[in-house]
Amino acid sequence: MLTFPRFVCATRAQTVHPVLLRSYITWQATEENYDCFIWEAAKATSAAPLFFEPTQLRASKATFVDGALHLNNPISEVINEAKSLWPGAGFKSIVSIGTGWIDPKGLELSQLKIHNVVKTCVDLAINSHKEAQKFVRDDRGKELSQAGVYFRFDVDRGIDTVALDQWQKLDDVDAFTEAYLTRSGSELERCAHSLCKEETARR
């Protein structure tokens, strides 16, 4: 049983519209409550085209594909959902974890047979980073960053050399991530301190 509210992002296959699959009821008039199991939500949010078939929920028969097609960095959705669930409450810690930067200059897209697919993947990764930058520039994100409660971690080198289906290269991903965390030591310490303060306050 899920104790705290959770959601994942998915995309309606028929309309290509982004949706949230929640573990709780939403009363927002423009949002739909989908009845699904955890494993169905997990399949829906990760049903990346070319790798997995679209996922259909057994209850509603709604069909979904990868949530990253629209919401590869759902930081704004997280903030909005939290404010809807707990009106007037403040934020103690927000940790946003990216999937790694992609350098489009290092990819010769014109020489690839699946040009459009690869370009889409690159755009998604770049948009994720742009969304993070946009968030810290707007009033909401700037306030949370200055208050020391918003932290963003996103491996900035090497991840773009590992394709989605290259599970054999997990050691490379580990190495790139460890190197990034070493370079980001001070920010990581601030994040840990913020989380520890939150845990101590609960006791």
Q: Where in this protein do the model-derived segments appear?
A:
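Conserved catalytic cores and adjacent C-terminal regulatory segments
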Residues: 1-203
